Structures are given as structure tokens and as C-alpha cells.
Regions:
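Charge-rich amphipathic alpha-helical interaction elements
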Residues: 1-106
Length: 106
């Protein structure tokens, strides 16, 4: 095998590993986004379940529900940034996977 052929063989192996790593990271990002979306749905369900309690209970319960609602709002705001970051990372990884595949075929 010529030196050039060996060089290209090594390059293709490295690119294949890079593509596999990019796909793995993409899978992890997608899983994180699914988890964040699931958490958002749970927060919405808790908020919906807490609303009937506001009219039925004393002022102390009202304060507790308001505190819970405030905490849920804070959690939802905290969810927005990681979700957006995960989406951006997912897009970057998709581009990296496509670029790696194009380099392999080039």
C-alpha cells in the first residue's frame, strides 16, 4: 500500500470516529431536549392541578400556591435557556455530521 493510500485510510478512520462522536453527541442533545420538554409538561400539569386550590382554601394555602406558582415560573424560565442551547447544539451537531459524511465521500 502506498504512503498516500495509508494516509487516506487513516484520515477516513479519523473522520468515521469524528462522525460517530458527533452522532452520539447529537443523540445526547436530543435526549436532553426531550427531558426538558417533559419537565415543562410536568410543570404545566402541576400548575393546572394547583389552580382549583386557590379558591377553595384559606389565605395560607393561597400564599403556598402563589409561592409554588412563582417557583414554577422560575423553573420554566430556567428551562428556556438550556432548551435553546440544546437546540443550537443539536443543529451544530447535525451540520458536523453532514460535513463529516461529505468529507468521507469526497
Amino acid at each position: 500500500m502506498t504512503a498516500n493510500a495509508q494516509r487516506w485510510k487513516r484520515i477516513l478512520k479519523v473522520r468515521a470516529v469524528q462522525r460517530q462522536l458527533a452522532e452520539l453527541q447529537l443523540h445526547r442533545c436530543e435526549k436532553e431536549v426531550r427531558n426538558l420538554v417533559d419537565l415543562g409538561h410536568r410543570i404545566s400539569a402541576i400548575r393546572a392541578a394547583a389552580q382549583p386550590l386557590v379558591g377553595a382554601q384559606s389565605g395560607m394555602m393561597l400564599r403556598s400556591v402563589c409561592e409554588l406558582s412563582s417557583r414554577l415560573d422560575t423553573a420554566q424560565r430556567a428551562l428556556a435557556t438550556p432548551s435553546r442551547n440544546a437546540q443550537e447544539a443539536r443543529n451544530r451537531q447535525r451540520h458536523a455530521v453532514v460535513a463529516a459524511r461529505q468529507r468521507e465521500t469526497a
